[in-house]
Amino acid sequence: MTQEERIAKLNELYKQAASLNEEFPAQLMEKLSIYGQILELLGGMWAAATKDWKLAEAKRRETIATVYSLDPEGTTKDREMKGEMAAAEWRRKEAEYEAEALRWKAAYVATQEQIQILKKKYEHMKEVAKGGI
């Protein structure tokens, strides 16, 4: 499944979840199930973004090492600077991919929290139905 397909599926699942009334236990349970599916997709997006981030980091390090080792001219500091300049594009990509990974991680954690809130709400409903508080 491509990223665009995953995002479309996420949007569809969020719409389904939003259409359910949390005041009815059956719909609340259905919403929990949908949030579980959302969590699974978010985990995949987080993993894919983390992979892109780490691959960009590896490419940046490889570029620096290659330039440093293949250019014997200049001082050590000059060679390091040349390596960093050659790897500047990879450093930018690394930052973009890191931001994307953190975005998906935040969405994942927020969804976990939402699931916990819904579970507490369901438990409260059960207690009220039994005559408790």
Where are the regions a protein language model picked out?
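Extended, amphipathic alpha-helical coiled-coil scaffold segments used for oligomerization/tethering
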Residues: K54-E96
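Long amphipathic alpha-helical coiled-coil segments
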Residues: E62, R92-M125
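Short, charge-rich amphipathic alpha-helices with coiled-coil/heptad character
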Residues: N11-L42
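Short acidic DE-rich linear segments
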Residues: M1, E127-I133
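Short, well-structured hydrophobic secondary-structure segments
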Residues: E30-A65
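Generic structural signal of hydrophobic/aromatic residues within well-ordered alpha-helices
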Residues: L10-A17, L28, I64, K77, ...
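Extended assembly-interface/linker segments at domain junctions
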Residues: M1-E5, K9
